Amino acid sequence: MRSLTLLLSLSTALRSVAAPHPASPQGQIPLGGIPSASTSEVGIGIGIGIEEDPFPPAAGSGHNDLEDVINASPLLSFHRDLVSIESISGHEARAAAFVADFLEAHNFTVVKQPVAGDRVNIFASPRAHAHSRPEILLTSHLDTVPPFIPYSLHRNDSRPTDRQLIRIAGRGAVDAKASVAAQIFAALDILHADPSAPLGLLFVVGEEVGGDGMKAFSHDPRLNPAPSRFHTVIFGEPTDFALVAGHKGMLGFEVLASGRPAHSGYPWLGRSAVSAILPALRRVDALGHIPVHHGGLPASHKYGRTTLNIGVLEGGVATNVVPAAARADVAVRLAAGSVDDARAIIAAAVADATHRDPAVVVDFSRHLEAYPPQDLDVDVPGFEITTVNYGTDVPNLHLHPRPDGPVKRYLYGPGSIFVAHGENEGLTVGALEEAVGGYKKLVQAALERTRA
């Protein structure tokens, strides 16, 4: 219901003013600042007005005008068509076929690398380079999280033609189909100006659920030979146009407790698994705040504290039964150190908190996939620099060593991680167009570095 209200909003148009990254937890030292929303998503003003969506769904003639904006742009219409295809993890086949057909129509040689069932990765290189191998790889992912949200357009009625205020919404509109579209059109622009540019494109499946697509690429000697053909890899994820200096590592584990069932009126006849697990979980929950020399998990200047999330807690069958089993599932975002060291710290902490109770154990067997913090390159000028706490396919791409030194790895993309995976996922027309320039800048820097 509409209501009169005092509207307060803060402009984020002052992008040049550095501010702590909104993803930074207490104690994390940001390497640079990016705002939590783009200038197209938050306006400035104070006054009495009608409270309503600043980006209402387009309707009537205005809707037709917005469709004309999209139809007039190959980039925007490609992005629209890709976002309109449902590609929840495990069901990426239609999206992969669409991207493959588009690239083949634009003079790319396309390899459809099998992953599982009808799921394929798309690896492409310019058809004119049939006898050479790409050296600069742009990569992102085709899958999205559920649920599917259809593509839609929204406008700000006060400035309906401002490309920074025309908002594109839908599942994957940001994560990561905006990166896919911007990378493809950056490559097309570069190849038009420099047909010899040794570019490759890789769009994988399964990034959101363990990275099986990128792992399949890594293990394919045809596409990923030794030594590595690539001297530069540019990963596409929502970074709000910042270059990411790295992201935290990740591991997971379960805490399992066993007890003995009994009638809850006579609890001394049994043993509560829930009561047994609680001291362990209290300690686990605090490990990111405990100094290492007191048995806690490490922190770093770059990434801040290690954080833990007890995401699942299960136990018991009824309130009148002493619970015979309890289980907790925990995710760790690791700020420093190795996975093995972190696992040892966690196991020791649980043992200490439970006085080495054999009925309470730590189990890492269901979370074998783990990785330490991932440091990335940020040596291209003209970008803000930050760190992020989310995971990516960076640790899933295993490249063979090159004789001339390590492979450069960059992480960049349009859109905010704070709307990715949410019901309001979206970005503006202007943001998507700006990202093409960002990817071109990264590619040009790689070309200049190697040709020099």
From Swiss-Prot:
The EC number of this protein is: 3.4.17.-
Look up the signal peptide feature and give its range. Answer: 1-18
Residues of the active site are: 207
EC primary class: hydrolase
Residues annotated to bind Zn(2+) 1: 175, 208
Q: Is Metal-binding included in the keywords of this UniProt record?
A: yes
GO process annotations (BP): proteolysis
- Which parts of the sequence bind Zn(2+) 2? 175
Has the keyword Protease been applied to this entry? Answer: yes
Glycan attachment residues as annotated in the record:
107, 156
What are the required cofactors? Zn(2+)
The record ties this protein, via Pfam families, to: M20_dimer, Peptidase_M20
Q: Where in the cell is it found?
A: Secreted
Entry note: cofactor: Binds 2 Zn(2+) ions per subunit.
Alphabetized, the UniProt keywords read: Glycoprotein, Hydrolase, Metal-binding, Protease, Secreted, Signal, Zinc
A GO molecular function term, named singly, is:
peptidase activity
Q: Which residues form a coiled coil?
A: none
A GO CC term assigned to this protein in UniProt: extracellular region
Cite the InterPro entries for this sequence. Answer: ArgE/DapE_CS, Bact_exopeptidase_dim_dom, Peptidase_M20, Peptidase_M20_dimer, Peptidase_M20A
Give the family this protein belongs to, as stated in its UniProt record. Belongs to the peptidase M20A family.
Name the UniProt record assigns to this protein? Probable carboxypeptidase ACLA_088580
Provenance organism: Aspergillus clavatus (strain ATCC 1007 / CBS 513.65 / DSM 816 / NCTC 3887 / NRRL 1 / QM 1276 / 107)
